Amino acid sequence: MGCTSERACKVRVVRRKLVVFVPVSALESVCEALFAAGAGHIGGYERCAWYTPGMGTFLAGEGAAPTIGEVGQERRIGEYRLETVYPTELEADVVRALLESHPYEEPVFDLYELLEPEV
């Protein structure tokens, strides 16, 4: 890392990033729920998010209750990859808001630790 002192090399986790794939039609409602739970704050800014369009594909198997399509039918659907940040202490609230607002039976999402230098 090229650190000159031990203090300069220490990092801590104070925020995390949520990445989730959301159907185009649900982007606004999922964002609103996440922001209401405390996600999207960066410094003096609120409601911060980044999203990019893509295409999701899935095949609902027996026992599934798909929101879109039917069991045994492969589907392709326009989705957004949505990213936002949140303080670590709000993780339970943010994940709960995601699961309650996302239309999919089993939403795909990742949680990443964001390292920040201790100063």
Predicted regions located by residue number:
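Hydrophobic structural segments
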Residues: 1-119
